[in-house]
């Protein structure tokens, strides 16, 4: 009996890609009758997602829907989510991949960095390392936060509003330093407001916290995870260079109304409105993003938090009430850097 040979890295990559492609075809068949090509297109649309968590995995799904022939690689810290990523049609690899990994020698025309700062001691350094995988031809997108904007007295805020000075806040410093690394290299930045979906976000925190030392009338700016992902896809596809985009639904809502709307939706059992005890403090910002919308041709599916809780019934693909035709992969992991 002959000895079986161990699979080479190339064979392993091919097998994983074949599995990912089969999953992609099955997903496509359940949602569309359009033909799906499985191999690279003449203009390469391959994408590397650094940090394919809740946001990054949604970007990967959106990119594959837009460019079915693309190869999408998801780079993670561990292999815990790799099986789930494969089910989405994504080829997974760990950050510290072996030198003989089948993807080790290549760069990508499109890269999105969506890993949160909480997962790294040297966040700007992590972003700089990710830039080495970009070939400069398509677009590199870094997902930052609207928390970098300095105005918090309730006034208007858009893409070009002033940001904090370096040295004001260590949390913001990490983001602004990482942004500069990206912009100087020709990449683009998507500053995202507070991210949420039916089971994650400020509303979930409010509903489980009886007393909050904050103002009920302070403004919060939000964007649904699905809309943040579609914004990133639009930014990538635009091939923009050294641009700053702002992700927000453009309809700020008070903390008190976030709790009120969530309770009135009826989607959260035994939900009780928290007591907001503060009467002083920052009022927040009133954010709009006209330049982002016009330059990318983008608008949010969930036009406001109120609309999500009322017109949409707090129902999205993350909701326990959602009944997909196929099993779904719902990554968890660290929360993304929250804007406001």
Give the ranges of each region predicted by the language model.
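Conserved Rossmann-fold NAD(P)-dependent oxidoreductase catalytic core, especially the SDR/UDP-sugar
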Residues: 128-170
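Alpha-helical substrate-binding/gating segment
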Residues: 204-212, 218-245
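N-terminal Rossmann-fold NAD(P) dinucleotide-binding loop
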Residues: 56-57
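NAD(P)-cofactor binding segment of oxidoreductase domains
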Residues: 106-142, 177
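Conserved N-terminal Rossmann-fold NAD(P)-binding element of oxidoreductases
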Residues: 46-51
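Mid/C-terminal beta-alpha module of Rossmann-like enzyme folds, strongest
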Residues: 37, 229-283, 322-340
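Conserved beta-loop-beta element that borders a ligand/cofactor-binding pocket
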Residues: 179-199
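C-terminal amphipathic/interface module of NAD(P)-dependent oxidoreductases
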Residues: 280-340
């Amino acid at each position: 009996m002959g000895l079986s040979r161990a699979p080479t890295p190339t064979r392993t990559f091919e097998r994983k890609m074949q599995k990912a492609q089969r999953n992609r075809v099955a997903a496509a068949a359940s949602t569309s009758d359009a033909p799906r090509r499985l191999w690279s297109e003449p203009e390469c649309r391959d994408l590397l997602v650094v940090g394919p968590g809740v946001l990054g995995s949604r970007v990967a799904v959106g990119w594959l829907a837009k460019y079915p022939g693309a190869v999408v690689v998801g780079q993670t810290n561990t292999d815990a989510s790799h099986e789930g990523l494969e089910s989405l049609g994504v080829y997974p690899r760990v950050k510290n991949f072996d030198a003989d990994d089948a993807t080790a020698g290549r760069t990508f025309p499109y890269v999105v960095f969506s890993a949160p700062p909480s997962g790294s001691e040297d966040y700007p350094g992590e972003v700089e390392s990710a830039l080495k995988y970009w070939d400069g031809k398509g677009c590199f997108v870094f997902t930052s936060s609207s928390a970098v904007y300095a105005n918090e007295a309730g006034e208007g805020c858009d893409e070009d509003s002033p940001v904090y000075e370096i040295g004001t806040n260590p949390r913001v410093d990490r983001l602004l330093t990482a942004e500069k690394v990206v912009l100087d290299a020709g990449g683009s930045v998507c500053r995202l407001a507070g991210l949420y979906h039916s089971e994650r976000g400020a509303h979930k925190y409010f509903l489980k916290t009886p007393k909050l030392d904050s103002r009920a009338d302070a403004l919060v700016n939000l964007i649904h995870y699905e809309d943040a992902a579609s914004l990133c896809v639009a930014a990538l596809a635009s091939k923009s260079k050294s641009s700053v985009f702002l992700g927000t639904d453009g309809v700020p809502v008070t903390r008190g109304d976030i709790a009120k709307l969530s309770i009135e939706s009826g989607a959260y059992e035994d939900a009780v409105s928290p007591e907001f005890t503060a009467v002083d403090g920052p009022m927040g910002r009133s954010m709009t993003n006209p330049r982002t919308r016009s330059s990318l041709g983008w608008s949010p599916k969930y036009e406001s938090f109120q609309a999500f809780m009322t017109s949409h019934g707090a129902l999205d693909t993350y909701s326990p009430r959602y009944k997909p035709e196929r099993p779904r992969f719902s990554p968890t992991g660290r929360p993304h850097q929250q804007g406001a």
